[in-house]
Structure formats: structure tokens, C-alpha cells
Swiss-Prot record:
Entry keyword set: Cytoplasm, DNA damage, DNA recombination, DNA repair, DNA-binding
UniProt region (Flexible linker), positions on chain: 144-153
Organism from which the protein derives: Herpetosiphon aurantiacus (strain ATCC 23779 / DSM 785 / 114-95)
BP term (GO), one: DNA repair
Highest taxon above the source species: Bacteria
Family listed: Belongs to the RuvA family.
Record's keyword annotation contains DNA-binding: yes
Taxonomic lineage: Bacteria, Bacillati, Chloroflexota, Chloroflexia, Herpetosiphonales
Subunit structure: Homotetramer. Forms an RuvA(8)-RuvB(12)-Holliday junction (HJ) complex. HJ DNA is sandwiched between 2 RuvA tetramers; dsDNA enters through RuvA and exits via RuvB. An RuvB hexamer assembles on each DNA strand where it exits the tetramer. Each RuvB hexamer is contacted by two RuvA subunits (via domain III) on 2 adjacent RuvB subunits; this complex drives branch migration. In the full resolvosome a probable DNA-RuvA(4)-RuvB(12)-RuvC(2) complex forms which resolves the HJ.
CC annotations in GO: cytoplasm; Holliday junction helicase complex; Holliday junction resolvase complex
Primary residence: cytoplasm
Its job: The RuvA-RuvB-RuvC complex processes Holliday junction (HJ) DNA during genetic recombination and DNA repair, while the RuvA-RuvB complex plays an important role in the rescue of blocked DNA replication forks via replication fork reversal (RFR). RuvA specifically binds to HJ cruciform DNA, conferring on it an open structure. The RuvB hexamer acts as an ATP-dependent pump, pulling dsDNA into and through the RuvAB complex. HJ branch migration allows RuvC to scan DNA until it finds its consensus sequence, where it cleaves and resolves the cruciform DNA.
Region described as Domain III: 153-197
This protein's name: Holliday junction branch migration complex subunit RuvA
Amino acid sequence: MIASVRGVVQLIGQDQVVIDVHGVGLAIAVPRTVLATIGAIGDTAQLYTHLHVREDMLALFGFSSPAQRALFELLLGVSGIGPKVALALLSAATPEELQHAIAREDITMLSKVPGIGKKTAARLVLELKGKFGVATISPQLSTNPGLLALNTELIDILTSLGYSTTEAQAALNALPADAPADTEERLRLALQYFGGV
């Protein structure tokens, strides 16, 4: 997987940028929110990327943070949502706004996004609501967006151990603010919350 790209901005389009990495121009589709922050042609830019593989093509999608990329990958896991619709969702709102809309079951807001009807918005809420939880976004995520991918992984681990999604989220929300951004250590602390260690 190509996890990130750093290079000189060669071209800025409506929904993509071309970044020159040592003489190779990579076309990277990006949300509009990223286009607004990419800088100008000739500037150096870094994007966190997702390589989408289909049998007939490879496509790179770029994001301003690992958390934004993690949310894109979560959206791709919802049936009926492909990369273009996931990109449209991230163009319409910040990751935090999307998470809040999903946690609040705000079908109206979600269905305003091009490519998302009421049925798809309802499916999105149904499949992802548990990922963000009753408490929606913990304060730790808003101050350190890189924890989104890590906490999503931890929720998956805890639910595979038999805890409910709500219990897993409660354990993660109870982690101290200075908890290290390390999967094993955060898992150990989460299990202590349950009295399992």
C-alpha cells in the first residue's frame, strides 16, 4: 500500500491534484477540503493516501490526515458506498461533522450529499453508528485525530473478544488523555477498564 506521498504540486484540478515525486507525477483524487489546503503549484505537499485496487485500474486517494484517511476507509466498508461517494461525503463535511451526523442518525444531512439517497444514508448510519458510539467522538480524538484509526482497530479487537461496541467505546473513552498511541498499551488499559488484566 502507498501510505503517503510527499512531493511538489504540479497541477490542481477540481477533484484531484498531481504531485511530482522524484520525476513521477501521481494523480491523486482528494476531497474539496484538502484542495483548499494543498497550497499552490510549485509548493511541497504531503498527503496520506489510500490505494484503491480494481481489476481494471489503480486509483490513489489523498487526505490531509491519517484520521481522514481512516474515515474514508470505514466509509468504503459500507455496502453501496464506493470511493467517489466516500470522497463526496468527505468533501461535504469535516470528519468530525460526519461522525457526529452518523452518531446522531442525521439522515437528512447525510442525504444532502450528491450520490447519497435516504436509503444509502440509513445504511451508512446502521453500519457505522457503532464505530463512533453513543458518546460520539471522545475528546482525545478531536485533539489528536490520528487516534481515530487506532481506536477503530481497538474497537474491532474488543468486539472480537466478546465485548459490545458500546462497552468497547466506553473503555476507550475512559482511557487517560496521556495514554500512549500504541495499540498494545491502549488495549492493555482498555482491558483494565473491564477488570480483565
